[in-house]
């Protein structure tokens, strides 16, 4: 029996320790494949074009382009769904991320199960998640 294809994920996080921890945690999830990990918004746009992920897990505060700018740029040139990851769940930040094209927004203290659930939902192109 052939297994279902993995969801290809690009991680965008400027905190190297957090980025590596996310990569390690997602690496144990059988149906998720981390295809790249970058530390700034501009690198995210370039990596998205090159790696063609299904889902981009996007930090809000980033160098070069912030998460809102990078999300908007990715949505203009890619079908990848963007799941935003933010340290604070400020209403203005959330509105800006959704307006830019994010399909879900999570806080950085979300559990692995919550993050994986959002990735799976985003990859199936479901309705926006709250």
Where do the language-model regions lie?
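Conserved acidic carboxylate
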Residues: 13
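Two-component/phosphorelay signaling modules centered on CheY-like receiver
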Residues: 16-36
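Conserved phosphotransfer cores of two-component systems
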Residues: 49-51, 73-80, 100
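The feature encodes the CheY-like receiver
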Residues: 63
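C-terminal output helix
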Residues: 92, 110-123, 127
């Amino acid at each position: 029996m052939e297994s279902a294809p993995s969801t290809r994920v690009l991680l965008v996080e400027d905190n190297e320790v957090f980025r590596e921890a996310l990569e390690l945690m997602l690496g144990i999830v059988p149906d998720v494949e981390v295809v790249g990990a970058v530390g700034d918004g501009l690198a995210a746009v370039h990596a998205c074009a090159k790696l063609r992920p299904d889902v981009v897990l996007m930090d809000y505060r980033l160098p070069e382009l912030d998460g809102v700018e990078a999300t908007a740029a990715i949505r203009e040139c890619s079908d990848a769904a963007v799941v935003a990851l933010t340290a604070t769940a400020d209403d203005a930040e959330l509105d800006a991320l959704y307006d830019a094209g994010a399909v879900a927004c999570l806080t950085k203290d979300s559990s692995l199960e919550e993050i994986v659930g959002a990735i799976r939902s985003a990859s199936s192109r479901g309705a926006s998640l709250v």
